[in-house]
Amino acid sequence: MEENNNIYPIFDRMLTRQDKEELLKQRGVMIWFTGLSGSGKSTIAIALERELHKRGLLCRILDGDNIRTGINNNLGFSETDRVENIRRIAEVSKLFIDTGIITIAAFISPNNDIREMAARIVGPDDFLEIFVSTPLAECEKRDVKGLYAKARRGEIKNFTGISAPFEAPEHPALSLDTSVLSLEESVNRLLEIVLPRVSRHE
């Protein structure tokens, strides 16, 4: 009899991603929203989740509210911590995607290097980068939390768009300017590219 040298035999018995996607009747994918604070990332993410839910599709939103207060509550806002924040988000997202769950992330993620790292972790075939390209002037005008005003007064250091740069994605799957597009229009454009990616063709 051939000896089994696998010291972790449980992995031979674990269900595959395909098994889970067949159960859910959908494909896992990462929808990564990037853009300035106040650009509309979270608003669009929530509206998209609702539309996908109506179609019987299981989603999970990851954003600053549920990440910074949980798994990343020990991280600050230094450059090192910002990179680690995105790395952990990407690793957690990969677990969801491998379970067949449509994962929606809404983070400023201000430069191409940090977003490319996330794409490498998740896997480029599963990564849809969505640029919410609302101009700074419009984001600053909205300023619901008063963050831009504080940044202008120097009360917040390294604030993206004011005292820290934002690099626009070079080749996003889609760009959405919410100063021009309504929420409904933005979601409809998203559905056009998302639904074909998440649908299983038996």
UniProtKB/Swiss-Prot annotation:
- The EC code for this enzyme is 2.7.1.25
UniProt keyword Secreted present: no
- One Pfam family cited in the UniProt record for this chain: APS_kinase
Q: What class of enzyme is it?
A: transferase
Swiss-Prot/TrEMBL keywords: ATP-binding, Kinase, Nucleotide-binding, Phosphoprotein, Transferase
- Pathway note: Sulfur metabolism; hydrogen sulfide biosynthesis; sulfite from sulfate: step 2/3
**UniProt similarity note:** Belongs to the APS kinase family.
- PANTHER family from the UniProt entry: BIFUNCTIONAL 3'-PHOSPHOADENOSINE 5'-PHOSPHOSULFATE SYNTHASE, PAPS SYNTHETASE, ISOFORM D
Q: Which NCBIfam families match?
A: apsK, PRK03846.1
Name the record gives this protein: Adenylyl-sulfate kinase
Q: What's the source species for this entry?
A: Bacteroides fragilis (strain ATCC 25285 / DSM 2151 / CCUG 4856 / JCM 11019 / LMG 10263 / NCTC 9343 / Onslow / VPI 2553 / EN-2)
Query: What taxonomic lineage is listed for the species of origin?
Result: Bacteria, Pseudomonadati, Bacteroidota, Bacteroidia, Bacteroidales
Gene from which the chain derives:
cysC
